[in-house]
Amino acid sequence: MGDLESHDLVCRHLCKQTNATIIAVDYKLAPEHKFPAAITDTIDSITEIISRADEFNIDQNKVILCGDSAGGALAAVGTIMSRDKLIPKVHGQILVYPWVDMTMCRRSMDIDLEGMILNKKTIEYFADHYLNSYEEQVDWRASPLLTPDLSNLPPTYIFGAGLDPLVDEGDAYKRRLLSFGNEVHYRLFEG
């Protein structure tokens, strides 16, 4: 549903408001590119960007991953891989209504108000076109909420929307991160 063009204005606004360097990743999308193509693109991009930090005027000690919806899952996966030293270190993550559980078993999935674009049916459609099997559905890289060890992650900010079918996933991820002793800031917006 989103791409570089749809998120350009938000990225520019964040850049202006925070005086930070914002780099948006144009990762491969399904159905043309199935799991784990988006993860591979994201990880390759993070590694390349951090390795060229001086060129991009980036302080390597202030790199934060951010994403919304499926991009929130990619940011979460990148943060976990950073902790495991599979990619360069990141220092925080911002997850905006993250889609972190491809099993789609949370109660908020049943939120289906008239006129909403995102509902369980559309989410199932996206998942069916992204994943090849149940094994991929429960793979921690597709469902970071199911990661066995979520300890020692950098500070996390999670934003949820009360009428979003993904709201319970963000809340569940918050609770799991807290149970592992991580610093988590959570804000739920009405609507």
Language-model region placement:
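Alpha/beta-hydrolase superfamily serine-hydrolase fold, recognizing
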Residues: 1-191
